[in-house]
Amino acid sequence: MSRVVLLLVCILGLCERVSAQDWPAFRGADGRGVADHPALKLNWGADENISWRQEIPGRGWSSPIVIAGRVILTTVTRDEGEPEAAKPGLYFGGNRLKPPTVVHHWNVMCLELETGDVVWQKTLHEGVPLTPRHIKNSYASETPVTDGKHVYVLFGDVGCYCLTLDGRLVWEKKLPPCRTRFGWGTAASPVLHEDRLYLISDNDEASYLLAVDKLTGDEVWRVDRDEKSNWATPYIWKNKLRTEIITPGTRKVRSYDLDGKLLYEFGGCSSITIALPYEAHGLLFVSSGYVGDTKKPLFALKPGASGDISLADDETSNEHIVWCQKR
């Protein structure tokens, strides 16, 4: 099975004209998901406003990143057979409690931005998967991140890897496989800030937030989390008062400082948290929602909170939560 990477004319034009506007991480620079440029197209499709297309072997739901005229992406291939196809639409019953029994290969690929030609490909791990996946998930769902000199690749229940832009492995850090809700697998992407890489693993066994040195892969600190399986990528909130690591969770949304100290927390999210928070107009927006839940809230926070700032059942705001849509 292969997937197709399509490059929009608007993205190619953006990176050609403004090198500072590479797409270095999940949802772009600072995780805001915003590409503000006059070259952006309103319409695109398989044959419209596309510069090139490239068949990619295997399966991977990670987003490509763009840096220095290169496109970096991850994918996982298998020695034989095809992964079970994900059915379209909303449905239940996609859980798979046992992993495949054939050898898989966890890969990172680099393509030329202007042409889509493969520049290099590297296999970072191979073996039989130790954990299952929902048929809508993949073994390569975490988006890489780059600081412009190195690329950091995470496969959630295999390991984290640092490579140079030409594909040379600098370090690797093995990560233990963990049981996730109904065997759905992992998806939270790594986050880079200054000299540290932040990795989160919310699972049904031993959840944690981990900071590692980006140059060596050595652990800087680790905090245990009273959480079960979540899939939300952490968000680095650089507000007017301080820099925080925001981690959405089913039990609590938590904020940590850059040394792993808990700053504040609040409850009220739905039973599944996936969405990345974002900042706009000086406020932080945190959301969660699941089709099976009656509550699908959206919170707006202002900087400076401490302690437990959870809303009471009859509240939609307090000193630090500016407003909440409980729907």
Please provide the spans of the model-predicted regions.
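N-terminal secretory signal peptides that target proteins for export/translocation
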Residues: 1-2
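Bacterial N-terminal signal peptides
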Residues: 5-15
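Noncatalytic, solvent-exposed loop/strand surfaces
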Residues: 16-327
